[in-house]
Amino acid sequence: MIDPVAIQIGPFAIHWYALCIMTGLVLAVYLSSKEAPRKKMTSDDVIDFIIIAFPIAIIGARLYYVIFEWSYYSKHLNELLAIWNGGIAIYGGLITGAIVLFIYCYYKVLNPIRFLDIIAPGVMLAQAIGRWGNFINQEAYGRVVKALPYLPSFIQKQMFIDGHYRMPTFLFESVWNIIGFTIICYLRRQKKLLLEGEVLAFYLIWYGIGRFVIEGMRTDSLIFIGLRVSQIVSIVLIILGIVFVILRRRQKGIPYYQE
């Protein structure tokens, strides 16, 4: 088993989980900052937004998780803030971050759809990297399998949990997001192919499909009234993405992402 603590300095510990999240964040900020000037925004617009949104999104992600696991946390109040042990729900962070983004764009007089187009690929890459934090913490895994012979030994060992090998759903989602990131980075450079807003739509549809399928393989899903919460949210994202594309294509005067 891999030690979840990457660096220990006296009483202070830096966890792999945090390093994965921060690595993803740094890459997302870098990519989005490079893209912003191409869309008539500045890198400062992106950086200022991240400084505001990231801590709020982390709070939202934790709150989302705690709400749906309240039966546990109501009896373990001392663990409410223990995010280094995991328990950060991506959808909670995305929802909170989106709310902050629209407020931020309103006050900065920026086009929120264009802003979302700019940051969506970076967010997808950050999610791919962040899933490796789940791997280190031995969470977000799937059902029991007999063996994992097709994977490197370090993954096999880490996925041996409670006496059984577990399906590495974290890896499936990470790979899915990397593929999606690669595709959308290619598509958005093609002239007169995607309309503004369709980079965002691609993210919603691609991530929604992948998360819906992979969530069905997991054994630690958040459940509400007998349903997997993330699958419900995934369906909503897919529908929103498809409807958004249809409406944009019907509307006249929408510029292409790449003229």
From Swiss-Prot:
Keywords: Cell membrane, Membrane, Transferase, Transmembrane, Transmembrane helix. InterPro entries: Lgt. This is Phosphatidylglycerol--prolipoprotein diacylglyceryl transferase. Belongs to the Lgt family. It is an enzyme of class 2 (transferase). One of its GO terms (cellular component) is plasma membrane. A 1,2-diacyl-sn-glycero-3-phospho-(1'-sn-glycerol) binds at R131. It comes from Streptococcus uberis (strain ATCC BAA-854 / 0140J). The gene is lgt. Its EC number is 2.5.1.145. The chain crosses the membrane at residues 9-29, 47-67, 83-103, 109-129, 167-187, 194-214, 227-247. It is found in: Cell membrane. Catalyzes the transfer of the diacylglyceryl group from phosphatidylglycerol to the sulfhydryl group of the N-terminal cysteine of a prolipoprotein, the first step in the formation of mature lipoproteins. The keyword Transmembrane helix applies. It is a multi-pass membrane protein. GO terms for biological process: lipoprotein biosynthetic process. It holds the Pfam family LGT. Pathway: Protein modification; lipoprotein biosynthesis (diacylglyceryl transfer). Disulfide bonds: none annotated. PANTHER family: PHOSPHATIDYLGLYCEROL--PROLIPOPROTEIN DIACYLGLYCERYL TRANSFERASE (PTHR30589:SF0), PROLIPOPROTEIN DIACYLGLYCERYL TRANSFERASE (PTHR30589). GO terms for molecular function: phosphatidylglycerol-prolipoprotein diacylglyceryl transferase activity. HAMAP family: Lgt. The keyword Transmembrane helix applies.
